[in-house]
Amino acid sequence: MSDSNQGNNQQNYQQYSQNGNQQQGNNRYQGYQAYNAQAQPAGGYYQNYQGYSGYQQGGYQQYNPDAGYQQQYNPQGGYQQYNPQGGYQQQFNPQGGRGNYKNFNYNNNLQGYQAGFQPQSQGMSLNDFQKQQKQAAPKPKKTLKLVSSSGIKLANATKKVGTKPAESDKKEEEKSAETKEPTKEPTKVEEPVKKEEKPVQTEEKTEEKSELPKVEDLKISESTHNTNNANVTSADALIKEQEEEVDDEVVNDMFGGKDHVSLIFMGHVDAGKSTMGGNLLYLTGSVDKRTIEKYEREAKDAGRQGWYLSWVMDTNKEERNDGKTIEVGKAYFETEKRRYTILDAPGHKMYVSEMIGGASQADVGVLVISARKGEYETGFERGGQTREHALLAKTQGVNKMVVVVNKMDDPTVNWSKERYDQCVSNVSNFLRAIGYNIKTDVVFMPVSGYSGANLKDHVDPKECPWYTGPTLLEYLDTMNHVDRHINAPFMLPIAAKMKDLGTIVEGKIESGHIKKGQSTLLMPNKTAVEIQNIYNETENEVDMAMCGEQVKLRIKGVEEEDISPGFVLTSPKNPIKSVTKFVAQIAIVELKSIIAAGFSCVMHVHTAIEEVHIVKLLHKLEKGTNRKSKKPPAFAKKGMKVIAVLETEAPVCVETYQDYPQLGRFTLRDQGTTIAIGKIVKIAE
């Protein structure tokens, strides 16, 4: 190449650099002024870089608006790395490069662009050059914004028809360098540069979300049935599939048209819960007279002759000796209209955790109150279990309550209407305060659990002429049916486990149904298991079990030691969520101190027990209106309602209260006292 050509090229290059420096404030492209003119004869690179657009086969991969190109340039056709402070660190590759740029062939080792291509800095005006670059500039990429834990939606964007995502993303990256022309005005360059930077920093933003440094920035999703169209469609398809398999006729054929109801007997210690349960089993024929006579003789020999009916429920030797129920007893009886499972909860304060586990499996609560003088006051006063059991039952979803005023035949009471009204009045006020509708959800009746008066047969009018209402069994048989979700996704919180010729788990089916041989998923371990055998309330093997049933399942695919109460058997297509962080509405019912960020306690949710701590208080709810405060409260005390972020030590299986009430409500306890109740409103991603 002649000296004159070299001089012309050098002049053009310096002129182009000067134009870029004037337009961009002499900051971004100052490195080009340091270009070594002595290296020109080896490759003719001046023309190739004047467009600042890069090649498809060797262009710039990423542009930094602060100071030049950061990443490596393809060594087949130019500089290997550009120094952000100004200038290239290494000389160009003398091998040059050949390729094709926008259908124009080039050979940058021997010649400029072929096929009549004219460098962009020669033969055109500044205005023409700007127009060309505007047309070539790519449109801003659409960004994805997570708006639901169950799916991803495009926010403020529409998808182009017929565009392949992989090719589109590749072209967007290749064109990212083309939009950085040095001759544009600063106001026109900065805005598109910022938009182009967003996709580059996506990885950094994702890391910030996973660390969740700020609770107020939590990406949380409130699960609703309409949150994600795809999930709704799949759920509808599953429900439709299961509806074809199970209908009302199948249920009627299996159980003779009788639905199943789980009852929990609760109340203060020595209120007569186990005795009443044992008498119900005897009166309905579930326990024969010979067995009762046997228990009566054994109780008399042990000096406990008045406890023989309770021995039907209390099978443990320690329970019989002390006259106190320790664990939740289970029994089954049947009437002409319904099938029942009795859950006999322990009344002692030491065993409240067992009572909570029993209440989580119940449909209807039977609150047993002793009318005997002194016993009623002890049970209902602060510290007694009557109030706490009623509160826990409401928290666990027991919305129907039968309050039986027991021991009405005691000599201190003698079926007194005045004593009965006193008990009813005090309990009514408390039940109303914790959320029960006294007119529709609660019924009161006087009974004698020991003599059986008003359990199955009406009390003698001579003894109690003032009560004309139904007996306990009459009311249970005629009350409204409990809503069942037979064709919903299968879910069974595990209440107990054992090893008997394999792994056996026990619990109440909260939704859906299960068949022998069906595959399920054990959460939170995400272990696939197979149902080998199904046993109903009477220990008989069946082929199918429905929502509301108390069952035992022999499962294959997991060992007994790998299961804990609180695990959930769930549908593989719609598994329950397993989380450690969620947002909940909490009502503080009993607390001597205060709750603030960092406060730890024990959470009971369905059959699970897990340690939990308060991450942050978000809002305080006004009394009456539940209006959220704008500023987060510094602490919470007794009587307050707050919205807070909670975090568990280990993953726990939960759902939002709106989707699955039974799996979205919980109780907080500390130092043997129930301090708060709550419901899950959002689940953190």
From Swiss-Prot:
It catalyses: GTP + H2O = GDP + phosphate + H(+). Residues 267-274 are annotated as: G1. Residues 406-409 are annotated as: G4. GO terms for cellular component: cytoplasm; cytoplasmic stress granule; cytosol; translation release factor complex. It is found in: Cytoplasm. Residues 258-484 form the tr-type G domain. The modification N-acetylserine is found at residue 2. Keywords: Acetylation, Amyloid, Cytoplasm, GTP-binding, Hydrolase, Nucleotide-binding, Phosphoprotein, Prion, Protein biosynthesis, Repeat. GO terms for biological process: nuclear-transcribed mRNA catabolic process, deadenylation-dependent decay; regulation of translation; translation; translational termination. Residues 1-34, 63-99, 112-234 are annotated as: Disordered. GTP binds at residues 267-274, 406-409, 449-450. The keyword Transmembrane does not apply. One of its GO terms (molecular function) is mRNA binding. The keyword Secreted does not apply. Residues 344-347 are annotated as: G3. Residues 323-327 are annotated as: G2. Residues 5-135 are annotated as: Prion domain (PrD). Residues 117-129, 223-234 have a biased composition (Polar residues). Residues 166-222 have a biased composition (Basic and acidic residues). GTPase component of the eRF1-eRF3-GTP ternary complex, a ternary complex that mediates translation termination in response to the termination codons UAA, UAG and UGA. SUP35/eRF3 mediates SUP45/eRF1 delivery to stop codons: The eRF1-eRF3-GTP complex binds to a stop codon in the ribosomal A-site. GTP hydrolysis by SUP35/eRF3 induces a conformational change that leads to its dissociation, permitting SUP45/eRF1 to accommodate fully in the A-site. Recruited by polyadenylate-binding protein PAB1 to poly(A)-tails of mRNAs. The prion domain (PrD) is a Gln/Asn (Q/N)-rich domain, which is unstructured in its native, soluble form, and which forms a parallel in-register beta-sheet in its amyloid form. [PSI+] is the prion form of SUP35. [PSI+] is the result of a conformational change of the cellular SUP35 protein that becomes self-propagating and infectious. This conformational change generates a form of SUP35 that assembles into amyloid fibrils. [PSI+]-aggregates sequester soluble SUP35, resulting in defects in faithful translation termination by read-through of translation termination codons. [PSI+] can be cured by GdnHCl and by deletion of the molecular chaperone HSP104, which is required for [PSI+] propagation. Belongs to the TRAFAC class translation factor GTPase superfamily. Classic translation factor GTPase family. ERF3 subfamily. This is Eukaryotic peptide chain release factor GTP-binding subunit. The gene is SUP35.
